[in-house]
């Protein structure tokens, strides 16, 4: 359990797990749940679920959750954690079988497995990609149910994440092997829990998802683009950071490019999100902010909680206008990661330390 002290009260947040993830909401989960605790809600949409920690938390607390993301690996994690209705121990035999396999050099070893002192940077040591090759091919050969396969794949990705030699993403790799990369790949049973059977997992564009579902509460944490005006058009997109997990899920052995051996479909023209768009439209408004405006307007929920990073594109005035167009802004909070404190936003001032990457903002809207 995560503990969180606020106004002399201690809140317990259910334990969750996930990979190292640039968009992880692990640190702000207590703040999210504190805000939500005052609401009378049953159904929740986690619109950009990513590593699924937010979805896991709501599900463990008894809410009916719709977990949505466009990433295949996020869908797999969501299925493993949110759709399981069995005793988790039933999956241990699968994990044990996969751990017992002998590794061999296959597609993953060819592209992502490195050895000591050869002068080339790789995300994993060869001994572990060999095990990955064997395990991933075996998963496809086994007669697994959808949930069993999701559990096996989630376990595999968690294991790979624990022996990588990266900073947490896969667009560049460390010059020297990380200490954890020397460990042997070993799968363990994910920390599953028994669900109520009412959760739903969706892999779709968020605009399609909000049109098809009505919920009491929606949480949105889009992959915002940088507010750096000097950011070049060729910058790496969010989806590209985790291209390797897509390859693990699909096992499709795609064509790759560049020094990091990224998937061809992780290029900007294939994988870019409108929420990451750093350009302005013909009216001088950031395209990403217009996407937020559209999302809030089209979401069928009584309450919407929007996360926004201090590194994003919005100006104070623009975001304030967007939030109030489709409802009433009833709460605005600023979180200082370094100080681990939350305080009300001062709308009469400029963004507080707006160039500080350690700030996160939470905006609660009640739709009209």
Task: Name each model-derived stretch.
Residues 1-48, 53-60, 84:
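S-adenosyl-L-methionine
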Residues 64, 71, 75-193, 230-284, ...:
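Class I S-adenosyl-L-methionine-dependent methyltransferase module
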């Amino acid at each position: 359990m995560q503990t969180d002290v606020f106004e002399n009260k201690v809140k317990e947040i259910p334990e969750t797990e996930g990979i190292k993830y640039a968009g992880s909401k692990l640190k702000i989960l207590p703040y999210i749940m504190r805000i939500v605790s005052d609401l009378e809600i049953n159904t929740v949409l986690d619109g950009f679920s990513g590593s699924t920690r937010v979805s896991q938390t709501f599900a463990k607390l008894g809410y009916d959750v719709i977990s949505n993301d466009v990433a295949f690996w996020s869908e797999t994690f969501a299925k493993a954690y949110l759709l399981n209705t069995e005793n988790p121990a039933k999956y241990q035999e699968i994990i044990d079988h996969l751990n017992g396999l002998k590794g061999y050099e296959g597609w993953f070893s060819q592209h992502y497995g490195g050895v000591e002192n050869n002068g080339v940077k790789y995300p994993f040591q060869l001994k572990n990609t060999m095990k990955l090759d064997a395990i991933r091919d075996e998963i496809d050969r086994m007669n697994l149910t959808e949930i069993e396969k999701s559990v096996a794949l989630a376990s595999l990705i968690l294991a790979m994440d624990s022996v990588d030699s990266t900073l947490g993403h896969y667009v560049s790799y460390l010059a020297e092997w990380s200490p954890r990369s020397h460990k042997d790949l070993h799968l363990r049973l994910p920390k599953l829990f028994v669900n109520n059977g009412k959760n739903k997992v969706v892999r779709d564009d968020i605009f399609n998802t909000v049109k098809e579902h009505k919920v009491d509460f929606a949480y949105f944490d889009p992959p915002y683009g940088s507010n750096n005006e000097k950011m070049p058009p060729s910058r790496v997109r969010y989806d590209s950071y985790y291209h390797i997990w897509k390859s693990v899920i699909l096992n499709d052995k795609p064509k790759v490019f560049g020094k990091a051996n990224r998937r061809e479909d992780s290029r900007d023209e294939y994988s870019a999100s409108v929420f990451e768009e750093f350009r302005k439209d013909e009216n001088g408004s950031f395209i990403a902010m217009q996407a937020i405006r559209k999302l809030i307007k089209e979401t069928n929920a009584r309450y919407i909680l929007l996360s926004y990073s201090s590194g994003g594109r919005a100006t104070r005035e623009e975001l304030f206008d967007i939030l109030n167009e489709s409802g009433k802004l009833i709460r605005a909070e600023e979180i200082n990661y370094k100080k681990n404190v939350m305080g009300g936003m001062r709308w009469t001032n400029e963004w507080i330390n707006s160039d500080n990457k350690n700030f996160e903002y939470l905006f609660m809207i009640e739709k009209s």
